[in-house]
């Protein structure tokens, strides 16, 4: 981990360059987690890394560019755009665009060819991390249309990310208007919701017991479940705990994940990783590279969405090991997801796997993007253990 941190020049994934910081304290006001504060003794802005959840709202807000951020900084995003000549740039939050199929439907695109030729697409953990300079460069300098797809403000996984983006968009529209420029900036908000099939419901109330928002409840007479879609955050926990498969989550449907596992198993994969898309950023952008190592990563909306049946299927079909990557409980973006993964998924799995002497082939790891190298470290450690078990 020290080598990785030294390579990037970060102790963690974020730091403040005090040499250019003006201590305007805009970052302090913008931070949703009270992770940045002004130190009266040192007269510097300081990041409390334990509170920080790597939303990068501070990075996008800083007028002096004094906050250095490891993931998706302005330069790396602009470099990515240079590789595409598509006339439209789409930047979407991972939280509401789970798949290319979903993105095509949202954009009204009929084929992958049409999508790739007309749109350059980028999925970010939160669109609120975009700096205003990016939008100015894309619209004015490059003459492209920008489509921004944040979550609805009340459903932002980073609390104020969507709000921060909309403030920038409103500011830029006013400036462009005063300059007589007609910018092509379109905002399409959205949020994932579960799909409920009442004809399958057993009325067992598992969904009600595990739902972190109170959106799922059992009503009488029936009994049958009912969902308040106004407060559903699309974590998918109810889909994982439902024994009748009466609930599904768009983009992460049970059958689609099952089909993906079957496809992966035919490629002689050593290790399958179910990775919460909020607890690791870099690896989810380099999934293809991992395949060369015999590792396949399936991004998940939350670690709580991991279904024990999918884990058992992976082992049954010949995959040597399964790893679940989750946020630390206190940092879960969906309230109870990490706890569900640990106490529901793992406990149920251990009951079955211990009978088959396979419990050592499934592991759960808690990490965060702020801890540089931890994901790779845990992955390689488990892969080594799997190879040793296979050898004996």
What do the PLM-derived regions correspond to, one by one?
Residues 179-193, 355-392:
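Peripheral docking tails and interdomain loops at the edges
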Residues 84-139, 144, 270-311, 315-316, ...:
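Conserved mixed alpha/beta catalytic, RNA-binding, or beta-rich assembly cores of soluble enzyme
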Residues 5-13, 114-120, 150, 157, ...:
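Gly-rich Lys/Arg/Thr-decorated short loops/hinges at beta-loop-alpha junctions or inter-strand turns
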Residues 21-27, 31, 52-58, 62, ...:
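Short cysteine clusters
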């Amino acid at each position: 981990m020290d080598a990785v941190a030294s390579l990037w020049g970060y102790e963690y994934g974020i730091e403040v360059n005090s040499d250019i910081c003006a201590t305007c304290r805009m970052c302090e006001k913008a931070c949703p987690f009270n992770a940045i504060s002004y130190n009266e003794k040192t007269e510097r802005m300081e990041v409390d890394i334990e509170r920080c959840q790597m939303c990068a709202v501070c990075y996008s807000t800083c007028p002096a560019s004094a906050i250095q951020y490891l993931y998706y900084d302005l330069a790396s995003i602009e470099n990515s755009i240079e590789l595409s000549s598509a006339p439209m740039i789409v930047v979407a939050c991972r939280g509401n665009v789970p798949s290319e199929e979903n993105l095509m439907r949202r954009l009204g695109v009929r084929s992958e060819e049409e999508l790739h030729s007309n749109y350059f697409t980028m999925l970010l953990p939160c669109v609120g991390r975009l700096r205003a300079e990016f939008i100015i460069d894309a619209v004015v300098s490059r003459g492209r249309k920008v489509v921004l797809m944040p979550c609805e403000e009340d459903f932002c996984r980073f609390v104020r990310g969507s709000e921060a983006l909309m403030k920038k968009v409103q500011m830029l529209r006013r400036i462009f208007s005063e300059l007589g420029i007609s910018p092509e900036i379109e905002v399409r908000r959205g949020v994932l919701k579960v799909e409920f099939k009442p004809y399958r419901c057993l009325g067992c109330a598992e969904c009600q017991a595990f739902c972190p928002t109170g959106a799922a409840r059992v009503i009488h007479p029936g009994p049958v479940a009912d969902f308040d879609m106004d407060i559903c955050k699309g974590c998918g926990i109810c889909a994982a705990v439902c024994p009748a498969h009466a609930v599904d989550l768009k983009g992460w449907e049970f059958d689609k994940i099952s089909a993906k596992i079957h496809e992966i198993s035919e490629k002689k994969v050593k290790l399958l990783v179910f990775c919460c898309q909020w607890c690791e950023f870099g690896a989810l952008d380099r999934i293809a590279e991992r395949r060369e190592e015999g590792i396949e990563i399936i991004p998940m909306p939350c670690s709580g969405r991991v279904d024990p049946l999918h884990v058992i299927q992976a082992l049954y079909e010949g995959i040597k090991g399964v790893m679940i990557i989750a946020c630390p409980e206190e940092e879960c973006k969906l309230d109870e997801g990490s706890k569900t993964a640990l106490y529901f998924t793992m406990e149920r799995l251990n009951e079955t796997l211990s009978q088959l002497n396979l419990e050592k082939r499934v592991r759960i790891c808690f990490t965060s993007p702020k801890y540089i190298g931890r994901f790779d470290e845990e992955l390689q450690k488990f892969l080594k253990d799997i190879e040793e078990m296979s050898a004996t």
